[in-house]
Regions:
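Catalytic core of non-heme Fe(II) oxygenases with the double-stranded beta-helix
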Residues: 3-145
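Membrane-proximal basic amphipathic "stem/tether" segments
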Residues: 145-151
């Protein structure tokens, strides 16, 4: 279902490498007060992230994942530097509502950035189920070779 939804983006990323091998990873996470995550674009092996939000009620709707765009339109995150960047380099576009029965999915690109604003609610339990799709290391090597060859 996710591959069909994001087919255009996947075709653009993998058009030069033929067979693509995927793996999945799931994590149940619980973020607490003062947790934050600076703008970042994830590891180069990541393809799609799906976050299934698991709050107990509507009281946490303002603590979802935020989407950012760089202030410098030419800024991209290379696979060599996929760490977290300073927030002052970005504009926050939206924070997804962290509400029951909701999910947020996105494709990893070199210019798509997300993060979590500092959690300031007392007794925060920010439960989410993360479902990530990755390419294999072999596929990543073929992808890097294709990028070098067809620059």
């Amino acid at each position: 279902l996710l591959r069909a939804k994001f087919k255009l983006y996947l075709d653009m990323r993998f058009k030069l490498i033929g067979d693509v091998n995927f793996s999945v990873e799931m994590q149940l996470i619980n973020d607490k007060k003062n947790y934050s995550l600076g703008p970042h674009s994830d590891h180069s092996r990541k393809v799609i992230s799906a976050l299934l939000y698991l709050p107990k009620d509507m009281s946490q709707q303002k603590i979802g994942t935020s989407i950012y765009i760089p202030k410098d339109p030419d800024f991209i995150s290379s696979h060599k530097e996929y760490g977290h960047f300073k927030k002052d380099l970005f504009h926050k576009v939206i924070t997804m509502p962290f509400v029951p029965n909701s999910a947020f999915c996105f494709v990893k690109t070199n210019n798509s950035f997300h993060g979590v604003e500092p959690l300031e609610i007392e007794d925060t339990d920010r439960w989410a189920l993360l479902f990530d799709i990755f390419i294999s290391e072999e596929t990543q090597l073929r992808e890097e070779e294709a990028k070098t060859k067809f620059k």
